[in-house]
């Protein structure tokens, strides 16, 4: 899980 942005981590999975 990419947790660069805890705010929208589930939305940014694969984008980070």
Swiss-Prot record:
Additional notes on this entry: Requires manganese but not calcium ions for cell-agglutinating activity.
pH-activity relationship: Optimum pH is 8.0-9.0.
Function: Glucose-specific lectin.
Domain of life, source organism: Eukaryota
UniProt subunit comment: Monomer.
Originating organism: Delonix regia (Royal poinciana)
Protein name in the entry: Lectin
Any GO BP annotation: cell-cell adhesion
Entry note: thermal dependence: Active up to 60 degrees Celsius.
A GO term for molecular function: D-glucose binding
Annotated keywords: Lectin, Manganese
Family as reported in the entry's similarity comment: Belongs to the leguminous lectin family.
């Amino acid at each position: 899980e990419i947790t660069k942005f805890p705010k929208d981590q589930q939305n940014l999975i694969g984008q980070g």
